[in-house]
């Protein structure tokens, strides 16, 4: 099965659980749009976590580019809370594995998307601040057929 995340222009929705540093869990909801141009791809999205009351929204805008390495994509994103993040997406079988770090080296993390079906991925990730676990999450990400 070929990967559809990144490679197809689709709208994606995520539903799952966000874990704060003390492992307290909260529901999460996210949406992602992926667009392609001749030189790069863009991934724009948000993640909402319902800690208490109104959800807190985290936004990210990624620029994704091919590299000279097979099965490796580079990316850069600006996150209002963390600053500029740079990383790679490594395509490994049915999984897409990402490692990232902030420009100042304070924040880093990893995330894995494992393809379950053509338009469905399982997602798990963890982020760190100065080497200490900051948060983690699990989610199911599905494509919206209306996004085509």
Regions found by a protein language model. Name each.
Residues 5-6, 121:
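Generic hydrophobic-segment detector
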Residues 110-148:
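Edge beta-strand at a domain terminus
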């Amino acid at each position: 099965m070929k990967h559809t995340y990144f490679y197809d222009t689709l709208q994606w929705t995520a539903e799952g659980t966000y874990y704060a540093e003390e492992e307290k869990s909260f529901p999460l909801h996210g949406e992602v749009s992926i667009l392609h141009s001749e030189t790069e791809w863009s991934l724009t999205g948000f993640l909402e976590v319902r800690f208490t009351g109104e959800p807190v929204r985290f936004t990210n805008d990624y620029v994704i580019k091919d590299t000279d390495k097979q099965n490796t994509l580079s990316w850069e994103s600006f996150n209002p809370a963390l600053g500029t993040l740079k990383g790679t997406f490594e395509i490994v079988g049915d999984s897409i594995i990402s490692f990232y770090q902030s420009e100042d080296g304070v924040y880093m993390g990893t995330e894995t998307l494992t393809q379950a079906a053509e338009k469905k991925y399982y997602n798990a990730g963890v982020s760190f601040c100065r080497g200490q676990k900051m948060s983690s999450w699990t989610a199911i990400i599905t494509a919206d057929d209306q996004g085509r």
